[in-house]
């Protein structure tokens, strides 16, 4: 299986097309990556939301309307203040809007976060018991930061190769 995160309008469409070429193998996500949040972010987000809506089907569930989507998650979204805080306010607004999509659709989140954990948690706390879950991908934090993130039900940490050696020390301290 290959999970295909999107970062903007173009890739949100491209990953869906690729998933149709490789059904059962490639699984698409839809979203606006924080590094792609620029001056035109509102227009980008509206287009991505339209793409998401186009590929949602409402179905009756036991507890009301549920949604089925051609996308498996909202992602890769988040906050990234590592290189610049120029579009900080815009990133915060874009992230919160996409978290709202997760709540509305039941799609999990693929979250990218660098140098912005406090800001990310401030937004997620509003939705803590309402979100379907997801992945805090490429986690590079410490034990305390991991503990804070793992308090969110149905969320997991993704630990990538860039941070593996430092993360091994942190992971050894996690509860079994």
Language-model-detected regions and their locations in the chain:
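Mid-domain alpha/beta scaffold segments of enzyme catalytic cores
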Residues: 1-176
């Amino acid at each position: 299986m290959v999970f295909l995160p999107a970062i903007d309008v173009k890739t949100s469409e491209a990953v869906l097309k690729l998933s149709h070429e490789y059904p059962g193998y490639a699984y698409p996500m839809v979203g606006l990556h924080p590094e792609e949040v620029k001056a035109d972010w509102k227009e980008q987000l509206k287009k991505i939301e339209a793409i998401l809506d186009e590929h949602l089907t409402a179905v009756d569930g036991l507890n009301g309307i549920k949604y089925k989507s051609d996308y498996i998650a909202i992602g890769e979204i988040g906050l990234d203040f590592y290189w610049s805080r120029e579009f900080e306010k815009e990133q915060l607004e874009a992230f919160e809007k996409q978290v709202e999509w997760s709540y509305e659709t039941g799609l999990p989140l693929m979250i990218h976060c660098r140098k912005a954990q406090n800001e990310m948690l401030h937004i997620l706390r509003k939705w803590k018991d309402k979100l379907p879950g997801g992945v805090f991908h490429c986690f590079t934090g410490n034990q305390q930061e991991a503990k804070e993130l793992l308090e969110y039900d149905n969320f997991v940490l993704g630990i990538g190769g860039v941070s593996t050696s430092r993360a091994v020390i942190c992971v050894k301290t996690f509860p079994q």
